[in-house]
């Protein structure tokens, strides 16, 4: 790949790799809690602490494909920097959700709600990128250039 192509996706790749490390951390927490409870064997049921860790991890895993899809679509079709920033914010919020779920379940609610809003923001960025592509294709006008012109004045 040439440097320009790598430059267009490097921030998205960094956020993706950070999310992989975070998933590993969550899985390690589940494994650690399972070993504390059952010795060496892994079971899905057990103490309340294990149930909370397992459920929090499962909830994060369930939302992960959606996050990756909208992160990369928003970054490639709209703008890499805001998409990567929103992706980092989502990872912080997901960490807050995970840790909050281990305590009182009401502590996880702000992380959950803000995470949904970040996913919506990335989705809207993706739609804006698709709309811009359609405008270029149909009318030959680039919406992104209009935004840059307006924002520099």
Curated annotation (Swiss-Prot):
Secretion signal span: none
Molecular-function GO terms, alphabetical: arachidonate binding; enzyme activator activity; glutathione peroxidase activity; glutathione transferase activity; leukotriene-C4 synthase activity
Alphabetical UniProt keywords: Endoplasmic reticulum, Leukotriene biosynthesis, Membrane, Nucleus, Transmembrane, Transmembrane helix
Disulfide-bonded cysteines: none
Domain of life of the source: Eukaryota
Family label: Belongs to the MAPEG family.
Official protein name in the record: Arachidonate 5-lipoxygenase-activating protein
Native source species: Oryctolagus cuniculus
Taxonomic classification: Eukaryota, Metazoa, Chordata, Craniata, Vertebrata
Gene: ALOX5AP
